Amino acid sequence: MSSAIDTKKVVVEEIASKLKESKSTIIVDYRGLNVSEVTELRKQLREANVEFKVYKNTMTRRAVEQAELDGLNDVLTGPNAIAFSTEDVIAPAKVLNEFAKNHEALEIKAGVIEGKVSSVEEVKALAELPSRDGLLSMLLSVLQAPVRNLALAAKAVADQKEEQGA
């Protein structure tokens, strides 16, 4: 019997460490999805480097307490799956939100974004943000705009002087 308890303690430690280490964690209710839909969801999450696992709620509750994320205990009812991402904050929210739009059975319940418990609305707002690369390209274009405008103004002045001199 003690080996079963030891195994459960290891699982609780694993969940707690994933909750602490991941940049983004999303809890979803997958009830109503068939096997092929869950397989497709897992494939999409794997492609985004997101780990997707189903744990018992009692073990998840203990891990949540260890990770000091007590705000999640309210959503740990019914069948839940957890998506962990250690690389990208936006990736799990984006993939799960897109999948939920096409499959009404998938319900986003809550999340942990950079160590802070987040509501469904916050997770969905995060999902609507562009990816990191998209944000960087937007920033780059904003930074380039003044230089580009200066170059265009200098060219216009040069063209005007050239016309006057001709």
Swiss-Prot record:
Keywords: Ribonucleoprotein, Ribosomal protein, RNA-binding, rRNA-binding. The keyword Ribosomal protein applies. The keyword Ribosomal protein applies. InterPro entries: Ribosomal_uL10, Ribosomal_uL10-like_sf, Ribosomal_uL10_bac, Ribosomal_uL10_bac_type, Ribosomal_uL10_CS_bac. Pfam families: Ribosomal_L10 (PF00466). Gene3D superfamilies: 3.30.70.1730. GO terms for biological process: translation. One of its GO terms (molecular function) is structural constituent of ribosome. One of its GO terms (cellular component) is large ribosomal subunit. Part of the ribosomal stalk of the 50S ribosomal subunit. The N-terminus interacts with L11 and the large rRNA to form the base of the stalk. The C-terminus forms an elongated spine to which L12 dimers bind in a sequential fashion forming a multimeric L10(L12)X complex. PANTHER family: 39S RIBOSOMAL PROTEIN L10, MITOCHONDRIAL. Forms part of the ribosomal stalk, playing a central role in the interaction of the ribosome with GTP-bound translation factors. Belongs to the universal ribosomal protein uL10 family. This is Large ribosomal subunit protein uL10. It comes from Bacillus velezensis (strain DSM 23117 / BGSC 10A6 / LMG 26770 / FZB42) (Bacillus amyloliquefaciens subsp. plantarum). The lineage of its organism: Bacteria, Bacillati, Bacillota, Bacilli, Bacillales.
